[in-house]
DNA sequence: TCTGGGGTCCTAGGACCC
DNA sequence: TCTGGGGTCCTAGGACCC
């Protein structure tokens, strides 16, 4: 596969720097932004509990296994990302650190607010993750750019209620670099702009190569073997070297470092290739009936996600895993693909196939830690193949679709799991360990009532 | 005591065909 | 008897992201 600067974005380039071996650009037609919320999950907790701003607090992963977000004060106290809870429990108690369970329904709604707010400042917004957005500016004034950046940060932080940082630069990768610099920047304005040749070079010279978007631990180790330690070191390698020693993704990264845009904006998110729901059990389980209920729950959730995205699947994967960290216990990991007779997103169909798979891979006598269901080979609902089917199957499909529709409308109105399939269950052993869940301040009326009274 | 969950992209290599 | 070599398709697994 050949790497070419994106054809549309190619038009941005107007002048090429004559000096140096490579392409370094002096002027750009368009500008990219990367906005991200600082300590997003913790920040959203502070919004409705203002006293938290003066207390150390963290947000925990499911089952309170590790830290996934830290408040400013917790960061200053030395609490790190992904630290295991069991190592920290005593210290946290001593330091008075509050540990919140994660509440993704609430975070998603806050993320939507951020997206809508930021959209008013640029031509295209792309949701990159729950707490990051890419922006594209088709027109801007070079001298006024820093001031525009500060205005976006000020207005969004105030309007949404959670602090943001912004990086502005001529490619997505450089915008990521600028954003990281903004987080560390001592001037506290929350913005870094990289738009001249000199600014970009200076930034890359001080930027560790392992912090680049797309360079993980494996590449970092490989690059250090070649004495490549900074982003500038990598950018100064000849293209053929990158081609020979790395992948096409790295080649794109190399172009982007040099100001040639290769990673286009994705205004409309592409259709998903697969959808997965999986959970670790709070405590290991070997009982088949309990695992069957968990798999039914996950399969129901996959079917719901499919319907929400207007997709059908043609195959279901089930997997079952023992606790990989308990190396002294006997291990068993397995998965299986079960093909569907026809495309479907109906809960009963997906669940029955998932259970068929589970029965095939379940072995008695193991302490299982995690199970999950994945739906694969996804196609849009609009691709109908009913004409090719036997009448009986077509009829069954229609019945299942109606049933799922009824299920969705009841559950959307009265809350998740108001109506369930018989195979599902919410036994105590299957419940997540989430002792300190914050209210869904923005999405659930009963929770909203709580805060207005309290 | 416990170590998340949900994704994408790319490459290598096997199977198969001509 | 020789057994090359180009092409496609599929899958497992690695690497990376938040």
Positions of predicted regions on the chain:
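Residues that scaffold, gate, or flank divalent-cation-dependent active/transport sites
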Residues: 1-130, 134, 257
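Acidic, metal-coordinating catalytic segment for phosphate/diphosphate chemistry
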Residues: 4, 9, 340-454
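DNA-contacting surface of Y-family translesion DNA polymerases
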Residues: 4-6, 219, 224-367, 385
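A residue-level signal for conserved active-site and pocket-lining positions in enzyme catalytic cores
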Residues: 36, 78, 88, 131, ...
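Compact, charge-rich alpha-helical regulatory domains located at protein termini
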Residues: 48, 162, 180-262, 454
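Short Gly/Ser/Thr- and Asp/Glu-enriched loop/turn motifs at secondary-structure junctions
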Residues: 128-132, 169-172, 311-315, 366-370
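Catalytic palm subdomain of template-directed nucleic-acid polymerases
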Residues: 135-154, 227
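Structured, non-catalytic alpha/beta "coupling" segments that mediate domain-domain communication
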Residues: 153, 157-180, 257, 369
